[in-house]
Amino acid sequence: MTTTPKEREPKVKVSVDIDPVPTSFEKWAKPGHFDRSLARGPKTTTWIWNLHALAHDFDSHTSDLEDVSRKIFSAHFGHLAVVFVWLSGMYYHGAQFSNYSAWLADPINIKPSAQVVWPIFGQEILNGDVGGGFEGIRITSGLFHLWRAAGITNEFQLLCTAIGGLVMAGLCLFAGWFHYHKRAPKLEWFQNVESMLNHHLAGLLGLGSLAWAGHQIHVAIPINKMLDAGVPAAQIPLPHEFILKPALMKEMFPSVDWGLFSGVVPFFTLDWGKYAEFLTFKGGLDPQTGALWLTDQAHHHLAIAVLFIVAGHMYRTNWGIGHSIKEILEAHKGPFTGEGHKGLYEVLTSSWHAQLAINLAMVGSLSIIVAQHMYAMNPYPYMGIDYATQISLFTHHMWIGGIFIVGGAAHGAIYMVRDYDPAVNRNNVLDRVIRHRDAIISHLNWVCLFLGFHAFGFYVHNDTMQALGRPQDMFSDTGIQLQPIFAQWIQSLHTKAIASTAPYVGASVSPIFGGDVVAVGGKVSMMPMVLGTADFMVHHIHAMTIHITVLILLKGVLFARSSRLIPDKAKLGFRFPCDGPGRGGTCQVSGWDHVFLGLFWMYNAISIVIFHFSWKMQSDIWGTVNPDGTIEHITGGNFATSAININGWLRDFLWAQSVQVINSYGSELSAYGLLFLGAHFVWAFSLMFLFSGRGYWQELIESIVWAHNKLKVAPAIQPRALSIIQGRAVGVAHYLLGGIVTTWAFFLARFAALG
């Protein structure tokens, strides 16, 4: 850490412009007002596509970085408003149309529902019996479990929260308008990274975690303790009573003096043992609820709060003390990295695409990590035995993660095309990566080929041996074994090493690594996962699909500005169909096209992950516990024997498990049957755009226009075929939508039918 003399670094002034942009409803009412050519109105049908493509492309509205920054900042508030309205709607459904109170009284036998379909012409068939005399649509968002963990005990509290969400949405809409039209920050404010880090670390993350820890200690833990003890929700004191009446807390946790200030005295006097009743270090899962101990969670959030509040005081702002990000980056050099990170400060403070690329890649990776943790270390009471919710949350976080990572590559390529400055990046890490991009991409290509042929070869070998009646020559746990020895070693390490690495913790992080079965109400919430040859094989398919996705996306970023084929690619922009007539073989080389192709491989990668997860959990984890202690898994442990060849995946996973969705007609699951059928249609519809030539459609359109002219009903706006890129965009959107909805219907119909 260094200090800076005052004269070298002037005080940062937080400055705003007053009334920079007038509020004009008249202007906003004109479609395309942000672009001079679009504002003239439509001449051809291409206008509507360009309107959508450019509405949020602020770079095309203005080249002024300050104005672009303000638009992004304002849009963030608009986005938050949408999120609050969306959340408010879900809480309102919980308040008005749900069986939350009934579920709270019996979370083992009653299923969550927060939507009741109105009878118009027979749709009421969708209202299934979820237990407790309630009929409605089964929900799988995990919100009921989250609400219980937070200490919500009745529908009125949900209604109040829903109203609060609308108030917050209104505030965000106001803030978005105010900070663009009335008091708009100057560019220096957006580029003041040290202040931003301090506020985000100490404020959002630090105080946010502290507030949540406070809520858990004062509201959630006491209410959950009473619920776990069997106290009816109606007899539990209201949340504010635990805060305003110290006697209630004293009754539950007598070792702390629950006064206005006396409660925090042990914290500052380091007498932390007083808090041991509600800030625990138990580890593992609560056997009653199958979830992480709420008292462990409160402990975690308090510790995180302290860390982030400290972290929020590390960076140098007005007081000349602390770290400078620019200095840290410029000092960050290794023996083989030339100028190291020099220039990256300028990159990340002048290109929001570069900043966004990193953020999307990080948050996408984090979402995938969340998916892996949420089932193994279920955070909310009774959610571990709600298998439909578990599969939904895993699938959701995997898709979101994959989409965000592709978005990271998209904005990385946009940065390279629009914002990259060779003068700033001289022999730094970015420049050096770009200069040896051929070595990177060719090696990555070799890895993809190796993984592809070997991983697929395992399955082809097994299909062949099975067809020849030679099971002893198959790769399997009973034939030629390919045991995942490193994964098994990590599992045993996590189980056994806990005694020496964390002596105060009562159990390892999750029974999934080893230990006892956690069963709630006769259903397995979590138990040790045995890995074998089938997992080893599908793992290498995961490795292949991930590496191919990375190959496509990284190639798109590294060759976005230039390539041997098109040295001046940067001049053509982020998206272009081909490099003009007379340049054969230059189609589908733009940065945009790499994102387009990357999306398909991302879809492949995530699909195989969620299929693997779904089948593995049904085969080896989820099921019922018999009175004698034996476990009946949903698919009876068939993963190890069936997932080792392609025929097994087709027959015992896709075909066998689609029984529920295919046979759903005439039941409350019939909507999933229609979605399954309809989503297949949407997926097939996408192929019409993907296996297509623009000229074919233009010729067809001209014939149709000729017929309209003959009949004197020709439109004023000239019809035009979609451009090549528009066609690809429509194609990939429907491909992903169709594929994802098909999978959604397939999973949910099965898990809802299984109960």
From Swiss-Prot:
It holds the Pfam family PsaA_PsaB. InterPro entries: PSI_PsaA, PSI_PsaA/B, PSI_PsaA/B_CS, PSI_PsaA/B_sf. PSI electron transfer chain: 5 chlorophyll a, 1 chlorophyll a', 2 phylloquinones and 3 4Fe-4S clusters. PSI core antenna: 90 chlorophyll a, 22 carotenoids, 3 phospholipids and 1 galactolipid. P700 is a chlorophyll a/chlorophyll a' dimer, A0 is one or more chlorophyll a, A1 is one or both phylloquinones and FX is a shared 4Fe-4S iron-sulfur center. One of its GO terms (biological process) is photosynthesis. Chlorophyll a' binds at residue 680. [4Fe-4S] cluster binds at residues 578, 587. It is a multi-pass membrane protein. The PsaA/B heterodimer binds the P700 chlorophyll special pair and subsequent electron acceptors. PSI consists of a core antenna complex that captures photons, and an electron transfer chain that converts photonic excitation into a charge separation. The cyanobacterial PSI reaction center is composed of one copy each of PsaA,B,C,D,E,F,I,J,K,L,M and X, and forms trimeric complexes. This is Photosystem I P700 chlorophyll a apoprotein A1. The gene is psaA.
